[in-house]
Amino acid sequence: MKAEIMAIGTEILLGDIVNTNAQFLAKELANLGIGVYHQSVVGDNSERILEAFDNAFKNCDTIITTGGLGPTKDDLSKELAAKYFNMEMCLREELLCDLEDYFKKNNLEMTENNKKQCYFPKEAIILPNPNGTAPGAILEGENNKRIILLPGPPREMEPMFTNHVVPYLSKFTDSVLVSKILRVFGIGESKMEDLVCDLLDNENPTVAPYAKNIDVILRITAKGKDKEEAEKLIAPMEKEIRKRLGDNIYGEGEVTLEEVVGKLLVDKKMTVSTAESCTGGMVASTLINYPGISEVFMEGAVTYSNEAKMKRLGVKKETLEDFGAVSEECAREMAKGIAKNAGTRIGISTTGIAGPGGGTEEKPVGLVYAGLCIDGITKVKKFNFKADRQKVRTRTMMNVLDWLRRELEKID
């Protein structure tokens, strides 16, 4: 089976709505072992939608559409799918009863145009939609071709696909694709590719690196007759990759760096406080995203001025005069000072020049010092980021969290 994912809606073409449906469907179809070779977007125009059906069926046997099932005149998906397969539309009385019940239960007024959502070909396989007013449908044409019609809103589309389309499609495939994602930080995509370059030509499982935001992901994908067989193919490849990348791998799947660090802090009962200058509270804010962090996060201070650094953190005036606020010495005193004043086992500091102004030949834009004080032992790292202001701040925050992760993993 080969499929094309087709989003229908002018609002997507214009960029008013981000098409997250395509990402969801692509992943789910891959898990079923169904190849997706094309994705397309077409506006609310009859001629262009029919043309899109024609073009899609030149390369696939299954089209999965999202959108265009609403009650308005420009919702055309099912009418045009029916026309394409020479099927006649008719009122499905059972759908009308369900729709009337939906409006009554939600104390809403049902207008005449809502009945449009109850018209389908009599041959259509109806896909119930308990989360909205627009049912989906599967239309099966000649030569093993089919169009699967799904609503546009993700909260309606995703459960409909999972509960009804997956069982339907499973009948047409005898294999599954299983992927495992390893999340990497501390080495760039090119460096990581060098470390695993000989593995990238492997066919089953396949190995593919992707840069995503600031971290990098490595996807291992295997095809098997079932999930268990595919996972057995992945296991030795994962073991080899972990051997090569070591602690640069911080997690699996959709886990974030902040979740990994937050869990380590809570599990190890390591209290923490932050003193930030150039990051302006980003480290504290990111840590606070983790549920339960209140058990260990005590305090976050944004000490932007020299006066605040001296008054709040105890940074010495001589340190600022001799070395400046952006210096190893200042970062060290900031980390020690916040840990002492907040009474925490860990103190984190950041100080740097985020730009666009303020840089010198000796201290250019992108120069950052970060301090990490753990149980009285303080270390400082120096970073040089060549990026705009926001990226300098974000990269500082991510590198500090990754540094903290590595240090926490050493603690029993």
Swiss-Prot record:
This is Putative competence-damage inducible protein. SMART domains: MoCF_biosynth. InterPro entries: CinA, CinA-like_C, CinA_C, CinA_KH, Competence-induced_CinA, MoaB/Mog-like_dom_sf, MoaB/Mog_dom. Belongs to the CinA family. It comes from the Bacteria. Pfam families: CinA, CinA_KH, MoCF_biosynth. It comes from Clostridium perfringens (strain 13 / Type A). HAMAP family: CinA_B.
